[in-house]
Curated annotation (Swiss-Prot):
Protein name from the UniProt record: Imidazolonepropionase
GO terms, biological process: L-histidine catabolic process to glutamate and formamide; L-histidine catabolic process to glutamate and formate
Main location: cytoplasm
SUPFAM superfamilies: Composite domain of metallo-dependent hydrolases, Metallo-dependent hydrolases
Classification via InterPro entries: Amidohydro-rel, HutI, Metal-dep_hydrolase_composite, Metal_Hydrolase
EC number: 3.5.2.7
Amino acid sequence: MSNNLIIINAHIVTPQGRTARKGEAMNELLNIPCGTVRVTDGIITYVGENRISHEKPGYKVLDARGNVLLPGFVDSHTHLVFGGFRPDEFIWRLNGDSYMSIMERGGGIINTVRATREASFEELKHKAEWFLDTMSRMGVTTVEGKSGYGLDRDTELKQLSIMQAINECPDRKVDIATTFLGAHALPEEYKGRSDAYIDFLINEMLPMIHQKQLAENCDIFCEKGVFTVEQSRKLLKAAQALGFGTKLHADEIVSFGGAELAGELKALSADHLLQASDEGIKALAQNNVVATLLPLTAFTLKEPYARGRKMIDSGCAVALATDLNPGSCFSGSIPLTFALACIYMKLTVAEAITAITLNGAAALGRADRIGSIEAGKQGDFVLLGTDNPHILPYYTGMNAVKLTIKGGRILHSN
């Protein structure tokens, strides 16, 4: 399939830059009502008015007919490789159980750990590919995939190897940025020995994953009852010393100092942040840490939404992601994520577009190559079925994507 494409008559709407956009700059979008984009060998080589020749040998020509052309969506926080499902826990939550109380009675993450350890490589890979196909139809062209449902050497490596295998497929629909999340929970084998488990991750897992080049980033669940701030600092500093980008699940359940730690370490991102303090928000803004907000999780858990408006007004770079996982948020719905962010977190449409494209890319350390429609970046696009980008939150929870284009290849026509 050719990776040479010329898109004409497109209403181009895109953030610009090779780093995250912060604060007021999140509202600044390039807007070309009738533009052309040229992609050569999968890379954007021209963006501008309809002034170049549309007839070029070896290029497919796509007439956008005035519809909105956006950068491909970047879902920068998912847990897409896992065994089993947990529908019963969803019902327990409806009946009043909390996320942490379910974990304390042996459910939650540990439930999925057991199922993931038992599942075969092919079973897990097939399920992940199904999720990716579904997400691609909603405009996702790059996704983050975390491990963290193994909590032992072999299963963590299995999860990461599955994502590597998908990335090596030449006709893949979505690129996966892999994140090692061995510190997702304390495995049963290490009950009461959390320091020893952190040492195992530092001394055995990180060097092995680094040598095998199985992950780009390292994450930890920094939360009361899971891993402490000091344990998180120790693991992430070790990861940084090996060249990993660092990320944190931070301040989701209680205000715990995770955002402050992310600022101290100058991490790529701090995620969740439902309970982030004012000082934590300030630390994120001052240290250029992307605040990755996950409105679907707050929606599912019936928790207050993260203070997206406050974060942007404080100078933060905010990203949006789905948090697809089998427990707290069994959804990869980009349309609903977009709507909830605008309705409940009070993001403008322009801010939400930036959050789910360029800032999502920055949260993965990839803003230099994806996240905006600019020469030199990958030819990843979303073509909407309308000329008005405001359709994204207005068409609440419904898919407004007409075409998904990956590296110049047209993947889906909805």
